[in-house]
């Protein structure tokens, strides 16, 4: 991924998160503001090259809940239309990056995605919106590729072109993700 790819993801996620009153970081930044601002070195310092401040999620607490129950029970206790889980997947890989052939190769994401799509009878092209784990901008890009939404090397350029923004080909992390 290029610096431009990472900045596109960071600014997109901050913009999406700024729309939510529940966001950890409720502000919008632009890609130009990250890169071209005279204060960019101060406001977006290098943390671990090539990652900068806006490439990482803040250390904070949050919560989400999902209630799993039979559809009939859900209809009886909620006015909302129940969501049916069509497929799921689970996989693990070595956590130690130096033990991987390629540190950006996310085999567990590939395997879990293949399981979920197979169970659901769908393909990545059938997905309209995706929420991916994005503690770092590079993860959103790598996961979008390993889940099959983009070919390897095309996730970052897709973000730069706006394909992962609202109104794009595949909006990713419309909540703002972990970074917002």
Tell where the protein language model's regions lie, with residue ranges.
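Short, conserved beta-strand edge motifs with alternating hydrophobic and charged residues
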Residues: 85-86, 128-133
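Acyl-CoA/ACP chain-elongation machinery
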Residues: 10-24, 93-97, 136-142
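Glycine-rich, mobile lid/loop segments that gate access to catalytic sites or pores
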Residues: 1-46, 50
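Stable alpha-helical structural segments in soluble proteins, enriched in small hydrophobic residues
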Residues: 65, 108, 112-120, 139-147
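Short glycine/threonine-rich loop-to-helix capping motif typified by GTGT followed
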Residues: 95-102, 134-157, 168
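Phosphate/pyrophosphate-binding loops at sites that engage ATP/ADP/AMP, CoA/4′-phosphopantetheine
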Residues: 2, 75, 112-126
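Condensing-enzyme catalytic core mediating Claisen C-C bond formation in acyl metabolism
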Residues: 8-9, 45-115, 161-175, 179
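Hydrophobic alpha-helical bundle architecture
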Residues: 120-130, 154, 173-180
């Amino acid at each position: 991924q290029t610096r431009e790819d990472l900045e596109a993801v960071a600014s997109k996620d901050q913009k999406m998160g700024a729309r939510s009153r529940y966001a950890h970081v409720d502000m919008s930044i632009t890609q130009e503001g990250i890169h071209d601002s005279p204060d960019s070195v101060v406001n977006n310092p290098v943390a671990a090259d090539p990652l900068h401040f806006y490439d990482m999620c803040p250390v904070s607490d949050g919560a989400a809940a999902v209630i799993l129950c039979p559809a009939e029970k859900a209809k009886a206790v909620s006015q909302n239309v129940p969501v049916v889980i069509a497929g799921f997947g689970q996989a693990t890989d070595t956590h130690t990056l130096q033990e991987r052939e390629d540190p950006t190769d996310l085999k567990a994401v590939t395997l879990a995605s293949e399981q979920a799509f197979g169970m659901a009878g769908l393909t990545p092209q059938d997905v309209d919106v995706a929420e991916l784990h994005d503690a770092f901008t590079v993860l959103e890009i790598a996961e979008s590729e390993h889940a099959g939404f983009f070919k390897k090397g095309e996730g970052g350029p897709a973000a730069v072109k706006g394909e992962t923004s609202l109104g794009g080909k595949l909006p990713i992390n419309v909540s703002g993700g972990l970074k917002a």
